[in-house]
């Protein structure tokens, strides 16, 4: 689960970053 933890956080961070930058 730890291996996916950084992946999930990275994906969420990327989406949040794009959403803020896109908006």
Curated annotation (Swiss-Prot):
Naturally occurring in which organism (per UniProt):
Tritrichomonas foetus
Q: What is this protein called?
A: Cysteine proteinase
EC code: 3.4.22.-
Which intervals of the chain are annotated as region Disordered? 1-23
The record's similarity note reads:
Belongs to the peptidase C1 family.
Q: Name one GO biological process term.
A: proteolysis
Top EC category: hydrolase
SUPFAM superfamilies for the chain: Cysteine proteinases (SSF54001)
Q: Which GO terms describe its molecular function?
A: cysteine-type peptidase activity
- Tell me which UniProt keywords the record has, alphabetically: Hydrolase, Protease, Thiol protease
List where Basic and acidic residues composition bias occurs: 1-10
